[in-house]
């Protein structure tokens, strides 16, 4: 972070300039450009799409057909208006392919239970953090109107590239 008085480069977040002692607390610590978009943007800015919702009692073959039909890499498992789990293509491959017949598999056995859910007014940085730390490629989003959206890693990349 550059001091506005003497121009010395200081460490990000420094309270006092190393060169002249200027009070740096009044200098904006927000990065410019890409970093600023990540810190200041909200998930609503990413325009999450509607989630594809199934129930925990739905059959695995019917869920696979729905995912293919909708060209979606994941579905949310919702019962009683509450997100109970998320099922991704990766879950299907690791849980079914070569292990058990899809007709014999149960959705609750394959899904990730109680996924992290964010809100539309959360910062974009929350989505990056949760996806990075959790190794997720999809995050459910609770909308202000009570609906449920879905955010993907592709949505984050699209946001950053605009």
What label would you give each PLM region?
Residues 1-162:
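Tandem CBS (Cystathionine beta-synthase) repeat/Bateman regulatory domains
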């Amino acid at each position: 972070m550059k001091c506005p008085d003497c121009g010395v480069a200081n460490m990000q977040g420094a309270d006092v300039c190393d060169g002249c002692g200027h009070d740096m607390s009044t200098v904006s610590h927000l990065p410019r450009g890409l970093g600023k978009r990540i810190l200041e943007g909200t998930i609503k800015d990413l325009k999450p799409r509607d989630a594809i919702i199934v129930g925990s009692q739905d059959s695995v073959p019917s869920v696979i057909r729905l995912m293919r039909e909708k060209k979606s890499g994941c579905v949310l498992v919702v019962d009683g208006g509450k997100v109970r789990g998320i099922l991704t293509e990766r879950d299907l491959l690791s849980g079914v392919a070569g292990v058990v017949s899809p007709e014999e598999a149960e959705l609750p056995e394959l899904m990730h239970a109680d996924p992290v859910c964010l809100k539309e007014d959360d910062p974009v940085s929350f989505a990056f953090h949760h996806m990075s730390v959790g190794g997720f490629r999809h995050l459910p989003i609770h909308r202000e109107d009570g609906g449920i959206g879905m955010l993907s890693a592709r949505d984050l990349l699209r946001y950053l590239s605009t």
